[in-house]
């Protein structure tokens, strides 16, 4: 999974999270 401020990521239940800073 991608992390930090690089973009979007899917959390463990598949919800799209925006810029995860």
Swiss-Prot record:
Q: Which GO terms describe its molecular function?
A: hormone activity; toxin activity
What's in the keyword line of the UniProt record? Disulfide bond, Hypotensive agent, Secreted, Toxin, Vasoactive, Vasodilator
GO terms for biological process, alphabetical: regulation of blood pressure; vasodilation
**Disulfide feature:** 5-21
Q: Where in the cell is it found?
A: Secreted
Identify the tissues in which this protein is expressed: Expressed by the venom gland.
Record's GO cellular component, any one? Answer: extracellular region
Family (UniProt) = Belongs to the natriuretic peptide family.
Please give the function described in this protein's UniProt entry: Scorpion venom natriuretic peptide that increases the perfusion pressure, glomerular filtration rate and urinary flow in the isolated perfused rat kidney assay. Induces a decrease of the percentages of renal transport for sodium, potassium and chloride and an increase of the urinary cGMP concentration. Also down-regulates the mRNA expression of natriuretic peptide receptor 1 (NPR1) in the kidneys whereas it up-regulates those of NPR2, NPR3 and guanylyl cyclase C (GUCY2C) mRNAs. May exhibit hypotensive and vasodepressor activities.
What is this protein called in UniProt?
Natriuretic peptide TsNP
